[in-house]
Amino acid sequence: DKPAEREDYSYQKQVDWMTDWLIANNFKNLTFFGQDWGGLIGLRMVANEPSRFDKVSMGNTGLPYNPEAPKEVLEKIKEFRESSLKLTPMSMAKEISEMDGKSLSQEDTEFHPALKFMYWQKFCWDTVDLPTGLLMTNMMEKNSRLNSAAYYLFVSLGLGKYFPFKSDVAKAYEAPFPDPSYKMGPRAMPSHVPTIPDQSLEAQRKAREVFKNWDKPFLSVFAGDDPVTNGIERDVLSMCPNAKSAPHIGGGHFYQWTRPKELSNLLINFINT
């Protein structure tokens, strides 16, 4: 029930599908909230159909726009993606943690965040049987070191599906993928995050122009302790001058899971005011 080819997946296709869904259902007077891809795709959808939305809120996401990435950064990313380096979940996670607080617009080529995010992109694409359960439980739950180490060992041996002590979260995130052929989406989509200039550049510019002139309520709700997106919040507030920033609530990247009550209360107050 999932497209099986890499070419089936792109940022633009996801935006088109969601915009078509929005129009087909004729939804109006909406309050939007997006996180992660929900923001990258959803904010573009909002920009396509702004009259359907009364309020916008988002967090741990953004509309990356980096038209002038340093040439040295582009060359390093290209070389890295084509390399034979084999990444593990642990080695990838270490590099991603060092993205913290950095902005795509910075000129420091040694510490440019795209040079860290490329580890996530390469890991996902090169790993045919992406360990979705292991990745998600590590980001969303507090597991014992013994359990995490044992799960990692099973995955390393190609036996991840046989690990007997999976949490319900791990099982839930593995359930949509009966075998590796179903995992093309999570493998392919990270490479479409526009941390460097790509085919989405002009569409990103146009969407950001909508939010530059946005005159309706816009709430930025970031966790504040997510190394992947901490550096994006400043860009969001700059992109939308009308945006207000909510207090950081913690909880890491998937804070809608780890801080559901705190996030819900912020959004309920935003909707009701």
Report each predicted region and the residues it spans:
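Flexible "cap/lid" subdomain of the alpha/beta-hydrolase fold that forms the substrate-access gate
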Residues: 1-33, 37-243
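Catalytic histidine neighborhood in serine/cysteine hydrolases
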Residues: 239-253
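Catalytic histidine-centered segment of alpha/beta-hydrolase-like enzymes
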Residues: 251-264
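C-terminal alpha-helix
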Residues: 266-273
